[in-house]
């Protein structure tokens, strides 16, 4: 009689789609890895067995044999390639830990399945298979019965998500869990797109589980996941992350910072960063940020405090009735949550004076004001029982709207808000997108909004709202609103994914500009662009530290008080420093936005000195990379005098160079400190150099580094310039710039200071 049979189904796992930047660089990929497991109960060589009269089998481990097998397996697991066994350091902690894991697993002689290692590459897996095959063959023929038997070691295929650039763009990309399911970021919001559909193979098997030879198997192929091609550009992202990190370190920013570069017309996000962040390859690890996170949770007890409790769960208080922080509490959950958050969309902040751009648009578009409308600022202004002041209690006198934005006059904007009125103010506030989420294609955008509706906007609420100190919004909401104010008046939906492709690269779906509505007229938008450019000026306006020579830039700073937070140790409110810049100012393509939450710079709280320089530095590299239109002035042949930057803080030194049309580079050294003062520069102060020359700055040495001059003869002028730049040298071209290099001012191989000017003669 034929044994009974049944259908068995074996899954075929789909390969998760990849994530690419705008130029096709891989940001997230999937590789095949293997779980190595063993069946000790079937590994007869690891033990001796005795059967009692009642049929009970007793197994006794052979420690020596178990140790031998464990050693061989461990060497292969740690070799990396399955071959370099001699290179494995058997005295290392890694070896000892892996060896103990294998030995303990193999010692479980009654177990049918024990895991020896996970995420093993194919080369190591093959090496282990070869070892097991050879071992079993040799011991099958052994004449010594104590050496006769077999080991049962097998492998299971799985997939591993890889992020080749580590923490790069981590808050945007997110990560997957142990099962390969998107848990945060794009990995989560596009889970179904990336995951694909698993397949399966159905076979008939007999009663003992063996496949029936003459039965046909039915296979349903897996459908691999689709790929995401982002609007995010790795070069722009790198620039943004670098300068944001510098700013956080230089200004002792307590509660992280965020930066965004976005196309104002389409909403395409070119860069989005939140720092400090995490490595999505190991998202549970917060050790790299431990000191920072420890300081943060203790500096923000109203947000993260874990307080001491008695045995009944009641909070313990000191003699003054204050709760007592539990210094021994486990903050790991907070640590991970903080570093995972995309600060641009998950947290609210008071925008401060950046919001004056929006109030200006309200006044102009409603017909209640224009750029020449005047109000008088006496330095203080009473509303109901509240008295408002401008920064430093300064009286600006009678000023126009354009001048009020440049001077960031609170008193002017309170009066403008009063003229606009509660209902009109709220209607525009709503139209600019502040009462709803932006709709960005990222998860965890906060649903919580903090603002006053029209019937809640009393005198005081309206006054505070007019200069951005009564509503809490997200940084991305502020970005999209400013974009609408300058792009002709259109509120667009921001997005990170540009298109979706299949596994063969064919485009399945493209994401274009999604205009939600027109908020203001084109003429109003034109007026806003004018007054924002007036704010930055040619390095002379209130936002002058965001100016980069050669570009028309509009901007606005915002220094807001965190009224909902505990005060600082000096008794003042914690601050948020932010700056939004658009360029080119006459027809903006991008917005560059930076926000620093609770900076603790000993010299200033003003965002014009804290956030504006970061924006300027980002623009100094991003604008030429993206090919943003310049101001049209021909500066070729222009000579610039290098300023004296020694003794100047790194961030301030950068600003001075940006304004003069010179580039800056922090010279590489082991202890470079961006928060420190410049100790050495080259070219030196007073040197006459060409417009666009790079000045190399040092913060930890009084001597410049040297570099070797490359041989550029015979190269095109452009290629020669690139070679010299890569070597840390400046270049001046003489002769026919379309020709090839005939001579160079320094011999190839010569050792010169970084930043030296090499003149090449072309013909």
Where are these regions (language model features)?
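Second-shell loop/turn segments in exported
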Residues: 5-8, 38-62, 110-119, 173-177, ...
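Conserved, well-ordered alpha-helix/loop/beta-strand core segments that scaffold catalytic motifs
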Residues: 113, 213-257
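Short, small/polar residue-rich loop motifs at catalytic or cofactor-binding pockets
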Residues: 6, 11-15, 198, 252-256, ...
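Beta-lactam-recognizing serine transpeptidase/beta-lactamase-like catalytic domain environment
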Residues: 28, 34, 206-220, 265-354, ...
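Ligand-recognition elements built from short beta-strands and adjacent flexible loops
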Residues: 511, 547-550, 564, 594-763
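Small/polar-residue-rich segments within soluble enzyme cores
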Residues: 64, 68-72, 97-225, 562, ...
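Soluble non-cytosolic domains of exported or imported proteins
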Residues: 14, 60-67, 118-122, 180-184, ...
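Juxtamembrane extramembrane loops of integral membrane proteins
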Residues: 10-78
């Amino acid at each position: 009689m034929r044994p009974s049979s049944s259908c068995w189904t074996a899954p075929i796992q789909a390969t998760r789609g990849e994530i690419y930047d705008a130029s096709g660089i891989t940001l997230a990929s999937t590789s095949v890895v293997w779980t190595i497991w063993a069946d000790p109960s079937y590994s007869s060589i690891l033990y001796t067995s005795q059967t009692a009269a009642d049929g009970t089998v007793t197994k006794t481990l052979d420690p020596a044999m178990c140790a031998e097998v464990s050693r061989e397996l461990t060497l292969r697991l740690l070799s990396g390639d399955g071959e370099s066994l001699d290179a494995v350091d058997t005295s290392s902690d890694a070896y000892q830990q892996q060896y103990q894991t294998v030995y303990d697993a193999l010692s479980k002689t009654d177990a049918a399945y024990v895991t020896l290692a996970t995420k093993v590459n194919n080369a190591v897996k093959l090496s282990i298979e070869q070892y097991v095959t050879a071992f079993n063959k040799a011991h099958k023929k052994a004449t010594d019965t104590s050496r006769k038997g077999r080991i049962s070691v097998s492998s299971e295929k799985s997939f591993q998500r890889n992020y080749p650039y580590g923490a790069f763009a981590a808050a945007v990309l997110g990560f997957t869990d142990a099962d390969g399911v998107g848990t945060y970021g794009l990995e989560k919001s596009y889970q179904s797109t990336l995951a694909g559909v698993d397949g399966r193979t159905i076979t008939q098997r007999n009663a003992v589980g063996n496949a029936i030879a003459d039965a046909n198997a039915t296979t349903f192929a897996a459908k691999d996941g689709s790929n995401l091609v982002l609007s995010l550009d790795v070069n722009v992202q790198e620039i943004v992350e670098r300068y944001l990190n510098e700013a956080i370190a230089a200004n002792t920013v307590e509660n992280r910072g965020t930066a965004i570069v976005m196309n104002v017309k389409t909403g395409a996000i070119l860069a989005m960063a939140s720092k400090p962040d995490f490595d999505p390859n190991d998202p549970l690890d917060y050790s790299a940020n431990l000191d920072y996170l420890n300081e943060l949770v203790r500096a923000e007890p109203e947000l993260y405090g874990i307080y001491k409790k008695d045995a009944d769960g009641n909070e313990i208080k000191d003699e003054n009735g204050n709760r007592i922080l539990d210094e021994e509490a486990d903050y790991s959950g907070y640590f991970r949550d903080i570093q995972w958050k995309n600060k641009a969309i998950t947290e609210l902040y008071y925008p401060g004076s950046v919001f004056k751009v929006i109030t200006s648009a309200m006044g102009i578009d409603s017909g209640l004001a224009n750029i020449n409308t005047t109000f008088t600022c006496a330095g203080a202004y009473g509303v109901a029982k509240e008295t408002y002041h401008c920064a430093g209690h300064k009286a600006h006198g009678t000023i126009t709207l354009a001048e009020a934005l440049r001077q960031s006059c609170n008193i002017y904007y309170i009066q403008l808000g009063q003229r606009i009125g509660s209902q009109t103010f709220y209607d525009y506030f709503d139209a600019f997108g502040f009462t709803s989420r932006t709709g960005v294609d990222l998860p965890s955008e906060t649903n919580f909004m903090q603002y006053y509706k029209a019937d809640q906007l009393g005198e005081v609420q309206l006054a505070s709202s007019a200069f951005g100190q009564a509503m809490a919004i997200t940084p991305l909401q502020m970005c999209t609103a400013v974009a609408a104010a300058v792009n002709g008046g259109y509120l667009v939906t921001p997005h990170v994914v540009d298109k979706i492709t299949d596994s063969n690269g064919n485009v399945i779906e493209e994401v274009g500009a999604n205009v939600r509505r027109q908020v203001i007229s084109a003429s109003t938008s034109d007026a806003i662009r004018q007054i924002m450019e007036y704010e930055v000026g040619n390095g002379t306006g209130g936002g002058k530290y965001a100016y980069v020579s050669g570009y028309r830039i509009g901007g606005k700073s915002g220094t807001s008080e965190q009224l909902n937070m505990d005060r600082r140790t000096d008794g003042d409110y914690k601050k948020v420093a932010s700056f939004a810049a658009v360029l080119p100012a006459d027809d903006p393509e991008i917005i560059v936005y930076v926000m620093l939450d609770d900076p603790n710079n000993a010299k200033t709280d003003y965002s014009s000195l804290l956030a504006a320089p970061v924006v300027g530095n980002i623009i100094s590299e991003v604008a030429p990379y993206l090919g943003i239109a310049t101001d049209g002035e021909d500066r070729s042949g222009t000579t610039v005098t290098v300023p004296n930057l020694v003794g100047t803080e790194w961030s301030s030194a950068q600003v001075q160079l940006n304004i003069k049309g010179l580039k800056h580079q922090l010279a590489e050294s082991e202890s470079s400190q961006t928060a420190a003062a410049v100790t050495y520069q080259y070219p030196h102060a007073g040197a006459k150099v060409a417009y666009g020359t790079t000045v190399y700055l040092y913060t930890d040495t009084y001597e410049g580094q040297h570099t070797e001059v490359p041989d550029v003869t015979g190269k095109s002028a452009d290629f020669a310039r690139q070679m010299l730049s890569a070597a840390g040298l400046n270049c001046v071209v003489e002769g026919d710039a379309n020709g090839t290099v005939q001579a160079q001012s320094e011999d190839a191989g010569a050792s010169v200071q970084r930043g030296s000017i090499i003149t090449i003669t072309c013909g």
